[in-house]
């Protein structure tokens, strides 16, 4: 940004602060809103929150019913600031409030957008049941703009929350329905997402053949897309499926390859790496290679304790 532009922005902000001393009511709330935009653009999210909250208070004193659109706008700024501050539970709560305002304003599209945003943030806050409830609410609501993609994404989100709640049978139903919708939308990337989650869910249900079917599709996509990072995850899922099917040599081959690829990633997914090592140890043990399996488990013990908090793992 040039010095001239920066000076213009500083001048604009100073003028707005000066107006604060001469305004009241709705005009004052509007000035606070403009100042919050300036704070947001320079990543001053705490300052933005303070300005937004003050503006919100004014509108409530003036009468909520006559200022719903202004309140929606302000609450959206508040939610986005909270997201940037990594406070997902608070941003989720704020999006829930936004959804209520949209209902009062008879805006079905806005309501759905806010409910979906709240559900996603509840997921980030590890509030799995609230996330599931939110995504189900979005799914069952009448959506005038519904498409196979939007319906599929709702189901995908429902399934991921169900996995966290150990509702694996229910998650399978959601993912299969999502997969069908993504195929209808001719979107191979999202069909792949459904296959990935189906491989995970069927494995949790110890259904080896179905886990292998979807893991193979997940793997095929990673090869066609030439995505090495994705291929590592796909090989891990395929290895787990082979293990469940008692195909131990195939499991060993896929899990060894998976680890070669997963460990190359700069931002390592330690939970996946540990899971692949533990699965590989099971395959090795089944193949009579207990010493090799034990060595592998000993090597990951401290990392496992660090990630999972297992005091016995160190």
Report residues per predicted region.
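Amphipathic alpha-helical segments of tetratricopeptide repeats
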Residues: 17-18, 56-63, 96-107, 136-146, ...
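C-terminal non-catalytic interaction modules
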Residues: 1-15, 257-314
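Residue register within tetratricopeptide repeats
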Residues: 10-11, 46, 89, 129, ...
């Amino acid at each position: 940004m040039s010095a001239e532009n920066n000076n213009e922005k500083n001048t604009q902000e100073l003028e707005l602060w000066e107006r604060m001393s001469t305004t009241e009511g709705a005009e004052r709330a509007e000035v606070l809103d403009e100042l919050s935009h300036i704070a947001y653009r320079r990543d001053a999210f705490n300052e933005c929150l303070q300005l937004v909250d003050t503006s919100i208070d004014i509108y409530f004193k003036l009468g909520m019913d006559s200022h719903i659109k202004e309140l929606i706008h302000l609450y959206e700024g508040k939610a986005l600031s909270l997201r940037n501050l990594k406070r997902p539970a608070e941003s989720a709560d704020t999006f829930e409030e936004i959804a209520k305002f949209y209902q009062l304003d008879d805006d079905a599209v806005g309501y759905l957008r806010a409910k979906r945003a709240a559900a996603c943030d509840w997921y980030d806050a590890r509030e799995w049941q609230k996330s599931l409830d939110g995504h189900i609410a979005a799914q069952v609501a009448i959506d005038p703009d519904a498409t196979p993609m939007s319906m599929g994404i709702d189901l995908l989100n429902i399934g991921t929350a169900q996995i966290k709640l150990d509702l694996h049978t229910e998650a399978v139903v959601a993912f299969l329905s999502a997969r069908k919708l993504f195929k209808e939308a001719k979107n191979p990337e999202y069909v792949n997402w459904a296959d990935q989650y189906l491989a995970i869910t069927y494995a949790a249900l110890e259904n080896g053949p179905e886990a292998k079917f979807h893991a193979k599709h997940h793997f095929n996509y990673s090869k066609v897309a030439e995505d090495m990072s994705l291929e590592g995850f796909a090989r891990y899922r395929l290895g787990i499926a082979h293990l469940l099917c008692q195909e131990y040599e195939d499991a060993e081959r896929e899990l060894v390859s998976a680890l070669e690829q997963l460990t190359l990633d700069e931002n390592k997914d330690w939970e996946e790496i540990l899971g692949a090592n533990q699965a590989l140890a099971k395959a090795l043990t089944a193949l009579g290679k207990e010493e090799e399996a034990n060595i592998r488990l000993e090597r990951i013990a401290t990392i496992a304790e660090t990630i999972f908090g297992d005091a016995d793992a160190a």
